[in-house]
């Protein structure tokens, strides 16, 4: 029996290994045909997780017995059993792996994502359950910080949460969440990609990590005349100019408007402690907008390779 299961698993793996991606496109009906049930989804997870070979987490043994139920593998030496989802961001999903796949698909392939309330109604789960898994997907969307922006880059800051009475300009004591944002433009001035960091205040110390993490020292950076950028200009090529509404920084203001509108109309309210995840989600989609056909393949691999995170590691009480 185990021999037959091993042969079946080897066949599935060889078929998976020969594929350039597990799914291409944005058609939800075709997506469901590719992943028709929980078992097929677990098989794809197992083959991605162990694509470079199996190694027992306890004793490093490389031989195993395969169990089709939950796609488990049992070490032949210490008998440690490990499921396909163990140690991944799919770990602990009890509402159905296929539903989890569909939620991840919608978060990546739709233009504006969806709210946890919408996902809960659509897939017959609680809002709390959908929110928790969607936060896991957002963790997987975090930038690798390996590909700094080059060429023409615009940088600015904004607040999330609307205006406060008596607050004008950059108010350090504002209770609203503050964000520093950078956008790379194409040669003809169109938006290419971008990143954003939640910041504590508008000081150079708070803003500079955005430069260090996401902008090349060779980039031609344009900012407004805020004093913090004068300090950062000591190590980056920055040109400062006065911000004139409707005249300059149009691309940056377009991005800021989209982020604020998305949070207000789709998410309704986002706590400051979770805001970075929503920014990561927005720019994950934006930065791959010309590669939409392969975007699920990318997020799937990230969900499998990212270490498991539990409820206490994700929830922020603020």
Question: What do the PLM-derived regions correspond to, one by one?
Answer:
Residues 2-318:
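Residue-level recognition of single "structural anchor" positions
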